[in-house]
Amino acid sequence: MSPEPYLGEVARTPVRHHILSVLVENKAGVLARIAGLFARRGFNIYSLAVAPAESHARFSRVTIVVDAESAPLEQIVQQLDKLVNVVAIKDLAPRDAVERELLLATLPLDYKHRPAMIDTITLAGASIVDVGPTSVTVMLAGTPEACDELERALEVFTKVELHRTGRVALPRLG
């Protein structure tokens, strides 16, 4: 009997996060200073993503997601603002932001469970991006909740490997 595709609801546990979009000078050591600041204060970084900002090699945008209970927003912003290479800080409230993550998973090619696997992948809005002789790689670019749901749905299949990026976010336009 093949595993059934997971069609359940996303668990909506009220986890509160602060999403900070931090514009920094693109210089060596800046990320280490930011991470060090969080470590010294005992703030846990839930998610972290860094990339060059808006095609300017001089700046990078750091998206940091922290647990609201462990890290008071005002204190984080004040401490970040003291760092020399920090140019700007935006607090993106989850309701006012568009958030995305990337999930990549390698699954064994199991022809017996192939239909259920394809149904699960398709229903999640994911796609197969690579096929090898014994495994496939699945990708989903979606909300953190969609990535959580796909990760849970793939639990019925043996995973060779699973990776998720840090969250990225932009303010909503309207």
Please give the residue ranges for each predicted region.
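Long, contiguous binding/interaction regions
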Residues: M1-S60, V65-G174
